[in-house]
């Protein structure tokens, strides 16, 4: 069994990116800049944005965090986004979710200029993903999953990939990326009947449902590759959506939780920020 070590891989990728950014600065004088916006005092959001800020600093990307009070109106947030859209020194914009309930998340996502939409959530980027447009900013977690498969030499072409979960953030985009990578893709969701009959056929199984230990050993084919996107808190520990201990001995490769997909998400955010800067300055 191969352990797909996202933590180690992300370190290697960030080292490569640091070199690329240094070279880009020497050639153009440009240092990519990411602006992250937090609305309210959600501790998890602050922690997550803080880790993004540290990652930016480490590779040589400028970053700024704008923290707005919980009472910020939707209009005030949209006006700030407009200002950042027009600021040529800002290459990438991120609005940390969740937002307060009085703010329409969709309106906020749509307001970000597609070329600065570092999370890849804007409809223009979703459409570009379908069309395999090279200018597409791909959603960070799905992009990280495909990078892991590639870096570990796991063939997607002709493979049967089963994705459990159909969210806009992970399930749908990773299904499309796998399809773009020439896999045959089955996407399962809460209305899928006889889930086990699908998962046991998977050469590559991606699980993103937010339920600890949801995928058990009898649901996985011998020799499969399992990508566990889940992050769940159980008895003070972080666990995935897959019963890791039960599944690990029958698979060819598997991601651990923590230390699997998670670190790759922030790494791909850094790569997307660099992509934003390159596209905006062509």
UniProtKB/Swiss-Prot annotation:
Function recorded in the entry: Catalyzes the oxidation of 5,10-methylenetetrahydrofolate to 5,10-methenyltetrahydrofolate and then the hydrolysis of 5,10-methenyltetrahydrofolate to 10-formyltetrahydrofolate.
A GO biological-process term: purine nucleotide biosynthetic process
Gene Ontology MF term list: methenyltetrahydrofolate cyclohydrolase activity; methylenetetrahydrofolate dehydrogenase (NADP+) activity
Biological pathway: One-carbon metabolism; tetrahydrofolate interconversion
Pfam families: THF_DHG_CYH, THF_DHG_CYH_C
Quaternary organization: Homodimer.
Catalytic activity from the UniProt record: (6R)-5,10-methylene-5,6,7,8-tetrahydrofolate + NADP(+) = (6R)-5,10-methenyltetrahydrofolate + NADPH; (6R)-5,10-methenyltetrahydrofolate + H2O = (6R)-10-formyltetrahydrofolate + H(+)
Protein name: Bifunctional protein FolD
UniProt-listed Enzyme Commission number(s): 1.5.1.5, 3.5.4.9
PANTHER family the UniProt entry points to: C-1-TETRAHYDROFOLATE SYNTHASE, CYTOPLASMIC, C-1-TETRAHYDROFOLATE SYNTHASE, CYTOPLASMIC-RELATED
Residues where NADP(+) binds: 165-167, 231
Keyword annotations from UniProtKB, A to Z: Amino-acid biosynthesis, Histidine biosynthesis, Hydrolase, Methionine biosynthesis, Multifunctional enzyme, NADP, One-carbon metabolism, Oxidoreductase, Purine biosynthesis
Family in the record: Belongs to the tetrahydrofolate dehydrogenase/cyclohydrolase family.
UniProt cross-references to PROSITE patterns, sorted A to Z: THF_DHG_CYH_1 (PS00766), THF_DHG_CYH_2 (PS00767)
GO CC terms in record: cytosol
InterPro entries tied to this protein: Aminoacid_DH-like_N_sf (IPR046346), NAD(P)-bd_dom_sf (IPR036291), THF_DH/CycHdrlase (IPR000672), THF_DH/CycHdrlase_cat_dom (IPR020630), THF_DH/CycHdrlase_CS (IPR020867), THF_DH/CycHdrlase_NAD-bd_dom (IPR020631)
